[in-house]
Swiss-Prot record:
Function: Non-catalytic component of the RNA exosome complex which has 3'->5' exoribonuclease activity and participates in a multitude of cellular RNA processing and degradation events. In the nucleus, the RNA exosome complex is involved in proper maturation of stable RNA species such as rRNA, snRNA and snoRNA, in the elimination of RNA processing by-products and non-coding 'pervasive' transcripts, such as antisense RNA species and cryptic unstable transcripts (CUTs), and of mRNAs with processing defects, thereby limiting or excluding their export to the cytoplasm.
Organism name: Schizosaccharomyces pombe (strain 972 / ATCC 24843)
Protein name: Exosome complex component rrp40
Disulfide bonds listed in the record: none
Organism ancestry: Eukaryota, Fungi, Dikarya, Ascomycota, Taphrinomycotina
InterPro entries named in the record: Exosome_RNA_bind1/RRP40/RRP4, KH_dom_type_1, KH_dom_type_1_sf, NA-bd_OB-fold, RRP40_KH-I, Rrp40_N_euk, Rrp40_S1
Length: 240
């Protein structure tokens, strides 16, 4: 995820401001992420900012506004960590930290039939993908990759510990392929991690003390530079 620059400066926008045409890719359609809305006024099409933050490019033709909010609004294909709060005949109702409870169909898993569908209990954690997000409907989840149909890491999260209340921007940084914090921790400690775009992170390691150390590092390193994160992690690991 790259920060978009305009005239050599990082682009910070406020609600109501228009994204300049010079920044918008003219090659094909554009995918708008959180914080951006499409408007059409007097035959003119424009992209307008709906919340304050920095403009980031998440792909060739994709962009979003990255803010330090903790309020999660579901978006299609977001990876989220949810908790089962109730069961019904066809599936589960899942808390993903948004204004609406999400639904997870019991057949929305890899290679599942009605006879082999998973049996999730109330309180269980799941790593899922948002398959439907509409402001007038409850979000829908799936536990498989949309392109391959494989689990690809989605499904029930067993054991471990879930961190909640992280800023959404912090989670976006954690999910990057080369994240300094997670790379530093991983070079010293083996662990499993699932990062949700809804401000939640699940961590599992060989013992409780190591899991607590990793969770502490994730919570405390949000505003540190790469060098500070490396030093902080090394100091924590010495205490094990």
């Amino acid at each position: 995820m790259a920060e978009v620059e305009e005239k050599g400066l990082l682009s910070y926008y406020f609600p109501g401001e228009r994204i300049p045409d010079s920044i918008i890719s003219q090659d094909g359609s554009i995918r708008l992420g959180p914080g951006l809305v499409f408007q059409k006024k007097d035959r003119e099409e424009e992209i307008v900012v709906s919340k304050a933050g920095r403009l980031h490019q998440t792909g060739k033709n994709a962009m979003l506004i990255d803010s330090r909010t903790k309020r999660y609004i579901p978006a299609t294909n977001d990876q989220v960590i949810g908790q089962i709060i109730s069961r019904f005949a066809e599936g589960y109702r899942v808390d993903i930290g948004s204004a609406h409870i999400a639904q997870l169909n019991a057949l929305a898993f890899e290679n599942v039939t009605r006879k082999s569908r998973p049996n999730l209990n109330v309180g269980s954690l799941v790593y899922a993908r948002v398959s439907l997000a509409d402001r007038d409907m409850e979000p829908e989840l799936e536990c498989f990759d949309a392109t391959t149909g494989k689990a690809a890491g989605y499904g029930e999260l067993k054991n471990g510990y879930m961190i909640t209340g992280l800023s959404l921007s912090h989670c976006r940084k954690l999910i990057l392929p080369k994240n300094t914090l997670l790379q530093t921790l991983g070079s010293y400690i083996p662990f499993e991690i699932a990062v949700g775009m809804n401000g939640r992170v699940w961590v599992n390691s060989e013992n409780l003390s190591t899991t607590v150390l990793i969770c502490t590092a994730i919570r405390n390193c949000e505003f540190m530079s790469d060098e500070e994160q490396i030093k902080y992690c090394k100091d924590l690991i010495k205490k094990l």
